[in-house]
Amino acid sequence: MAAGFGRCCRVLRSISRFQWRSQHTKANRQREPGLGFSFEFTEQQKEFQATARKFAREEIIPVAAEYDKTGEYPVPLIRRAWELGLMNTHIPENCGGLGLGTFDACLISEELAYGCTGVQTAIEGNSLGQMPIIIAGNDQQKKKYLGRMTEEPLMCAYCVTEPGAGSDVAGIKTKAEKKGDEYIINGQKMWITNGGKANWYFLLARSDPDPKAPANKAFTGFIVEADTPGIQIGRKELNMGQRCSDTRGIVFEDVKVPRENVLIGDGAGFKVAMGAFDKTRPVVAAGAVGLAQRALDEATKYALERKTFGKLLVEHQAISFMLAEMAMKVELARMSYQRAAWEVDSGRRNTYYASIAKAFAGDIANQLATDAVQILGGNGFNTEYPVEKLMRDAKIYQIYEGTSQIQRLIVAREHIDKYKN
């Protein structure tokens, strides 16, 4: 399996050397003036998108309902995605990865989410867990923890949220006490995606005991091996949607972490943890768009087949207008994540656009899933049709990686600051 993945990486890396993506721009690359913005993907981008699309439609969709019913973690699908090069796409080339940009990851994420957002979330959970190391890890940390993920289909997790600290990240209570060359960690985390499947965690803990210490100095980011003594993994949570994703609580009791596993240094953790979101929120938004597109497709197909009052549903203006509104919304949501991804790949701070994309796409996914259920009527409310699952799966897009309300706070702050400055 590792040999197959290695061949896949070599092929895709060779593609990237020949200008694989017009949308993805390295931060240090100078763009030629006057070229403007292109809506056209390169042929290679289309091929990668087609690979993800084929995988979603032929391998994910046929088994998605069963995984939703059982809640079983989709190991065969994750292994297959890894073999196809559809996982861990952010890992740098010098660590054995593809070194793709956020725009590229978004194209893949949308297609995977079209098949099942539970599967997509498990895969995207890896990207979120890896991102702090990608943006802040030293060479040794990157090679040790990212490199191994290109050798076999391992998982990782972003271990930040706590029972009493979700949106309020600065309110976390998990403590890290420095003793010699080690840190002793005690605390409880909650709602950790891939929590029971991860090989290692990115963990954020309070290292400054002063309760008045500012957030940008009070927390430290750690890489923690999942098999470290003192880690207690809780039961898998039975959630409303995305049920095949592994979500758990984790307790850390006198867990020893060596100093070499600290990212950057003491007090740098909050900035590292928040910095990851500029790269991962566009990808989450892309997943929401994938679900929204699926809802639109299912509703349209049904409306073209179902007759009422002697007419096809699409021949009723009320339904055709609903479909038109759905189509408009999904196209705009897609543009929002593409702009956010393009900005960060161009080396610019994209917090404003990332939050717009995350909030807008999350809301649109919920609206379109609801509309799809409405168009299917009683059938939409039944498990024999896929749209009820879409409606359950959609809700979390307004919650994880920053609620829709938090995104609006960020957008408002960024918008107002532009006028103040």
Curated annotation (Swiss-Prot):
Organelle transit peptide: 1-25
Active site: E401
Catalytic reaction(s) noted: a medium-chain 2,3-saturated fatty acyl-CoA + oxidized [electron-transfer flavoprotein] + H(+) = a medium-chain (2E)-enoyl-CoA + reduced [electron-transfer flavoprotein]; pentanoyl-CoA + oxidized [electron-transfer flavoprotein] + H(+) = (2E)-pentenoyl-CoA + reduced [electron-transfer flavoprotein]; hexanoyl-CoA + oxidized [electron-transfer flavoprotein] + H(+) = (2E)-hexenoyl-CoA + reduced [electron-transfer flavoprotein]; octanoyl-CoA + oxidized [electron-transfer flavoprotein] + H(+) = (2E)-octenoyl-CoA + reduced [electron-transfer flavoprotein]
UniProt modified residues of type N6-succinyllysine: K69, K179, K212, K217, K271
Enzyme class: oxidoreductase
Annotated positions binding FAD: 158-167, 191-193, 306-308, 316-317, 374-378, 402-405
Coiled coil region boundaries: none
Taxonomic superkingdom: Eukaryota
Sequence positions bearing Phosphothreonine: T351
Residues bearing the modification N6-acetyllysine: K69, K212, K217, K271, K279, K301
Cofactor(s) the protein requires to work: FAD
Gene Ontology terms, MF aspect: flavin adenine dinucleotide binding; medium-chain fatty acyl-CoA dehydrogenase activity
Binding site for octanoyl-CoA: S167, D278, R281, R349, T351, E401
EC assignment: 1.3.8.7
PROSITE patterns, A to Z: ACYL_COA_DH_1 (PS00072), ACYL_COA_DH_2 (PS00073)
Modification after translation, per record: Acetylated. Could occur at proximity of the cofactor-binding sites and reduce the catalytic activity. Could be deacetylated by SIRT3.
General function of this protein: Medium-chain specific acyl-CoA dehydrogenase is one of the acyl-CoA dehydrogenases that catalyze the first step of mitochondrial fatty acid beta-oxidation, an aerobic process breaking down fatty acids into acetyl-CoA and allowing the production of energy from fats.
Assembly and interaction partners: Homotetramer. Interacts with the heterodimeric electron transfer flavoprotein ETF.
Name of the protein described by the UniProt record: Medium-chain specific acyl-CoA dehydrogenase, mitochondrial
Organism: Pan troglodytes
